[in-house]
Regions:
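Short, solvent-exposed loop/turn elements at domain surfaces
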Residues: 50-56, 171-174, 286-288, 312-314
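A short C-terminal boundary segment appended to hydrolase-like catalytic domains
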Residues: 292-350
Length: 350
């Protein structure tokens, strides 16, 4: 379907107070009987920002239909994978802006197609989500979380584990006011900080942490989470959303780290120089549009970007589309990132 035709059809749907996913979407990528699930394959998709019929707008941001369209594209792409990934991680901003229950009710059956195919779905909270309406929609998370009241999940992926943290800062006086909008910064509440500190002390298996917000924004019992990851041999890397761009950063200081070693030779001073943080693209809202596949083996993780588009605040008609958007999409599609389970292994001198 052409974009203009899609927008015409969805314009009529906006008149309804509660939207439903397009009925045709379930047939776009039908479940194949006997399809193999690969335990060494995962997908990360963040920042869905799907509007399902709740509050319409905040400031300059109008309601748009393209997030629903791109969510269908992403889910269809994942269901077309053969074999299928064992797990799909979604670290937050599922809702359009406010965590309205209409948004979650729209998204649930769309993501439910993954579960129907045998894929495990692991959801997290972003600054545009809301726990009360989320728990009302996905009731199992209130029962399985190890931190009461937070959306926290630990996943055993064989050679490594993943922990989905809840970095939603939900001050009531802010989130309830439509004119002020949701709080943007991330935070781990006290109960989650204490739980995570105790978990980290017990970890003996490579464990990758993830949250909606970057590690540098989060504190754990008075320490910056980025510093904890940098110095802990069992925390090889961090994955987050929020910024809508495929982007890599390091927990070590790259330039200082390659100075002189104690023996007078050039080399890396710290194993933290090999620890990376990956920012995920947005499934649908703005920036890099797509998701990330992840191959898991005994050595580490291999991420690869799958980008369907790139645009600014919103898409524009093809005749008005800036040429550099296509260039950026082409440049960022298919990019790879390695994270190694044991990055602190001794590095030979240069």
């Amino acid at each position: 379907m052409k974009r203009r035709d899609f927008l015409k059809l969805s314009g009529a749907a906006i008149a309804s107070s509660v939207l439903r996913p397009a009925e045709s979407s379930a047939a776009d990528a039908p479940k194949r009987p006997g399809r193999r699930i690969d335990p060494g394959l995962a997908v990360f998709m963040s920042d869905l920002h799907v509007w399902g019929g709740g509050r319409r707008t905040f400031g300059p941001y109008p309601i748009n239909d393209y997030p629903r369209e791109h969510l269908d594209v992403a889910v269809n792409g994942i269901l077309a994978m053969d074999p299928l990934p064992a797990t799909v991680f979604v670290p937050g901003d599922i809702s359009w802006l406010y965590g309205d229950i209409e948004d979650y009710r729209y998204v649930k059956p769309v993501l439910g197609r993954l579960e129907e195919a045998g894929v495990r779905l692991v959801l997290g909270m972003g600054n545009h989500d809301r726990r009360e309406t989320f728990f009302e929609t996905w009731t199992q998370y209130a029962e399985t979380t190890p931190v009461k009241g937070a959306v926290v999940t630990r996943v055993d992926a064989g050679p490594c584990d993943f922990i989905m943290l809840d970095s939603l800062h939900q001050p009531e006086k802010v989130i309830q006011l439509n004119q002020t909008g949701p709080y943007v910064a991330g935070v781990l509440d006290d109960a989650q900080q204490q739980w995570l500190e105790a978990e980290i002390a017990k970890i003996r298996k490579p464990t990758y942490l993830m949250a909606h917000h970057p590690a540098s924004q989060l504190k754990v019992c008075g320490r910056n989470l980025a510093d904890i990851i940098r110095t802990n041999p069992n925390l090889p890397g961090f994955i987050h959303g929020h910024d809508h761009f495929w982007r890599l950063s390091y927990f070590g200081t790259k330039w200082e780290s390659v100075w002189v070693r104690g023996d007078g030779k050039y080399g890396f001073k710290s194993p933290a120089d090999f620890k990376r943080q990956l920012c995920l693209p947005s499934v649908s809202n703005w920036g890099d549009i797509g998701y990330v596949t992840c191959r898991i083996d005994g050595e580490g993780l291999l991420f690869e970007s799958v980008l369907n588009d790139f645009y600014g605040v919103h898409p524009v008609p093809k005749e008005k589309r800036p040429r550099h958007w296509d260039a950026i999409r082409a440049e960022h599609n298919g990019l790879k990132c390695h994270m190694f389970h044991r990055p602190w292994a001794e590095v030979p001198a240069c």
